Regions:
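Soluble extracytoplasmic domains of inner/organellar membrane proteins
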Residues: 134-174, 179-182
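Short strand-turn-strand beta-turns centered on an Asx-Gly dipeptide
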Residues: 114-117
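Structural motif
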Residues: 60, 74-78, 102, 145, ...
Length: 200
């Protein structure tokens, strides 16, 4: 009788251990699957500089929808670009202003951007578009390309500059969709956790 009780306790103990092992095994596989999905669909980058101020600040951590699933940029999208001919391919963050086939012109005297001869309403910009960086306007966006500008038009290096110019879609790393961790403007402002959320 005593030996039967001992055997039952051993079996029950082993069942409990087996359950824990199976649970940890399943949890590990689930975490690996989630990591794989994350790596396929998303990327995380850090904003460097003030060209998107005040929409995005220096040091902001952004979640990107990767270019594997982000195929068709649209006006207003905030995208991350790696252009090998500019700053050794370091990622830069800009806003899509026009897509292939659209005509872009800029009235630098009044700071107004036109797409297909229609003035853009740009509530997101920090300053008017008065800085002429050398690109000739008007221009038509080439096939499989986009035209981008930074929201902080007074300091941004973007498609106005011939060094950057129009962006080939293959140079897009992804679309910024979520602000994960807020940075500061010039390192002198406290983090504003209220900025965490969907990027517009």
């Amino acid at each position: 009788m005593a030996s039967d009780r001992f055997i039952r306790k051993s079996v029950e103990g082993n069942d409990w251990k087996n359950s824990v092992v199976m649970y940890l095994h399943d949890l590990l596989y689930m975490l690996m699957a989630m990591l794989l999905v994350f790596l396929l669909f998303f990327r995380v980058i850090v904003v460097s500089g003030d060209s998107m101020y005040s929409t995005l600040l220096d040091g902001d951590y952004l979640l990107l929808l990767g270019n594997l699933f982000y195929q068709e940029p649209e006006h207003g999208d905030i995208v991350v670009i790696s252009k090998k001919t500019f700053d050794n391919g370091k990622p830069i963050v800009k806003r899509v202003i026009a897509t292939e086939g659209q005509k872009v012109s800029i009235d630098f005297e009044n700071g107004i951007v036109y797409v297909d001869d229609v003035p853009l309403e740009e509530p997101y910009i920090n300053s008017l578009t008065k800085l002429d960086e050398g690109t000739k306007f008007p221009l038509t966006v080439e096939e499989n390309c986009i035209f981008v500008l930074g929201d902080n038009r007074g300091v941004s290096l973007d498609s106005r500059n011939p060094m950057i110019g129009q962006i080939d879609k293959r140079e897009i790393l992804g679309k910024a969709i979520f602000l994960l961790i807020p940075g500061t403007s010039h390192g002198d402002l406290p983090q504003d956790m209220g900025r965490i959320g969907v990027i517009k």
